[in-house]
From Swiss-Prot:
NCBIfam families: atpA, PRK13343.1. It comes from Campylobacter jejuni subsp. doylei (strain ATCC BAA-1458 / RM4099 / 269.97). The record marks S362 as: Required for activity. PANTHER family: ATP SYNTHASE SUBUNIT ALPHA, MITOCHONDRIAL. This is ATP synthase subunit alpha. Keywords: ATP synthesis, ATP-binding, Cell inner membrane, Cell membrane, CF(1), Hydrogen ion transport, Ion transport, Membrane, Nucleotide-binding, Translocase, Transport. F-type ATPases have 2 components, CF(1) - the catalytic core - and CF(0) - the membrane proton channel. CF(1) has five subunits: alpha(3), beta(3), gamma(1), delta(1), epsilon(1). CF(0) has three main subunits: a(1), b(2) and c(9-12). The alpha and beta chains form an alternating ring which encloses part of the gamma chain. CF(1) is attached to CF(0) by a central stalk formed by the gamma and epsilon chains, while a peripheral stalk is formed by the delta and b chains.
């Protein structure tokens, strides 16, 4: 048998040309130690800060500490079955979460994975969890109102689209209720809402979701949950995942509202992670970058300029204080980052004034520009009236005889306090708020007993809707009160008082 040399060489050449060297090179490391949701890994020399890794058991991790001989990795999962010597491989990518319309109405974890047993989330787009906040030129000043449906807030501490307004108070003062009311109030306003629960009991989150479903609010709401039983790393990531989902709507010329409930637990989760990673502790054992932790999160809420679509992302962070101490580390940090705060007080809550908003300590630094003219007109003197009432109230504890003017002021104040009370989960439309506050500040309630203010409120809305529907319509369309409308309104209120009270 003869071999032809040129035949053999052509076959070899063909084999060489068609040879497919498909080698996948993976960089792996070994676990040195693992404890409390943090793994110390040796061998991942080229890893980036914030890079994702995969453990032997399929859990994902994120590199946070890059040291000379090892890498500190937080485990984004239960970490079951991980032991010393187990291998860890680099994924060469940063953490991304799903964004888009597919998430609306769903309950997801901090990685965007569904936890509501309603099947997979079919998202078309994924975005990086850590994004840089928009610069100055991309923004526009806050000028559109975001109505919360809560009388005391819309009149005295107005919130605008793109604002960051802190809700602060002790435990059990109604902070979550204010936030949930605001979400319910966005029905039909074209605002997508995101509720981020950080370190909450699962029963509490289930209750919030149930409330939102009852009021039809889950149709435009995404719930991101990192519960108390979840690893600290997931509690740390949850707000960033939530704001990434919100930014998608803002960047697509829509309006979004995000609630962080609450950032005190977020800071505690970050402190826990940092201490296990052996980062040096600072004040109250928080790490040195705890201010940056919250500032980089809250700066991502913004109102975009017209060239970028004029979308907005409004943030309502919640902070829980201990015994009303607003001067603690985390509260002062977040107060200085946000555009104002709504301060809720235990004493007011216990005395039946709910929502328990302390009008003196609550401010909105940029919301005034967003408030509609009608609300501004009727609530102009309201803050001053309430402040004078509080002062007089303290004074009357020592002095019994009051002059006529002081007595009138005291009585007006009592009625205004009663007027601003509101049951939970019953947000009011702007036109109804304007009518009610107009009645209070213009003295129409001065001759009605304090105990009958609620009766007046319950009756005036259906009365105007039935007999004078044009009043509500004009307030809605004009967004201001002219002399004709004021006259009509005064006439309607007097007519109602004469016939029904």
């Amino acid at each position: 048998m003869k071999f032809k040399a040129d035949e053999i060489s052509s076959i070899i050449k063909e084999r060489i040309e068609n040879f497919d060297l498909n080698l996948e090179i993976e960089e792996t490391g070994k676990i040195i130690s693992v404890a409390d949701g943090v793994a110390k890994v040796y061998g991942l020399k080229n890893i980036m800060a914030g890079e994702m890794v995969e453990f032997e058991n399929g859990d994902k991790g994120m590199a946070l500490n890059l040291e000379e001989s090892s890498v500190g990795i937080v485990i984004l999962g239960k970490g079951e079955g991980l032991k010393e010597g187990a291998s860890v491989k680099r994924l060469k990518k940063l953490l991304k979460v799903p964004v888009g319309e597919a998430l609306i109405g769903r309950v997801v974890n901090a990685l965007g994975e569904p936890i509501d047993a309603k099947g997979v989330v079919n998202a078309n787009e994924y975005r990086f969890v850590e994004e840089k906040a928009k610069g100055i030129m991309a923004r526009k000043s806050v000028h559109e109102p975001l109505h919360t449906g809560i009388k005391a807030i819309d009149a005295l501490v107005p919130i605008g689209r793109g604002q960051r307004e802190l809700i602060i108070g002790d435990r059990q003062t109604g902070k979550t209720t204010v936030a949930v009311d605001t979400i319910i109030s966005q029905r039909g306003q074209g605002v997508i809402c995101i509720y981020v629960a950080i370190g909450q009991k699962q029963s509490t989150v289930a209750q919030v979701v149930k409330r939102l479903e009852e009021h039809g609010a889950m149709e435009y709401t995404i719930v991101v949950n990192a519960g108390a039983s979840d690893p600290a790393a997931l509690q740390y990531l949850a707000p960033y995942a939530g704001v990434t989902m919100g930014e998608f709507f803002r960047d697509n010329a829509k309006h979004a509202l995000i609630v962080y409930d609450d950032l005190s637990k977020h800071a505690v989760a970050y402190r826990e992670m940092s201490l296990i990673l052996r980062r040096p502790p600072g004040r109250e054992a928080y790490p040195g970058d705890v201010f940056y932790l919250h500032s980089r999160l809250l700066e991502r809420a913004s109102k975009l300029n017209d060239e970028l679509g004029a979308g907005s992302l409004t943030a309502l962070p919640i902070i829980e204080t201990q015994a009303g101490d607003v001067s603690a580390y985390i509260p002062t940090n977040v107060i200085s980052i946000t555009d104002g705060q709504i301060f809720l007080e235990t004493d007011l809550f216990n005395s039946g004034i709910r929502p328990a908003i302390n009008v003196g300590l609550s401010v909105s630094r940029v919301g005034g520009a967003a408030q509609i003219k009608a609300t501004k007109q009727v609530s102009g003197t309201l803050r001053l009236d309430l402040a004078q009432y509080r002062e007089l109230q303290a004074f009357t504890q020592f002095a019994s005889d009051l002059d006529e003017a002081s007595r009138k002021q005291l009585e007006r104040g009592q009625r205004m306090v009663e007027l601003l009370k509101q049951p939970p989960y019953s947000p009011l439309s702007v036109e109804k708020q304007v009518v009610l506050i107009f009645a209070g500040t213009k003295g129409f309630l001065d001759d009605i007993a304090v105990s009958r203010i609620k009766e007046f409120e319950d009756g005036i809305y259906p009365f105007i809707e039935a007999k004078h529907p044009d009043i509500f319509e004009q307030i809605r369309s004009k967004k201001a009160l002219d002399s004709d409308l004021e006259e009509k309104l005064a006439k309607a209120i007097n007519e109602f008082k004469a016939n029904h009270l």
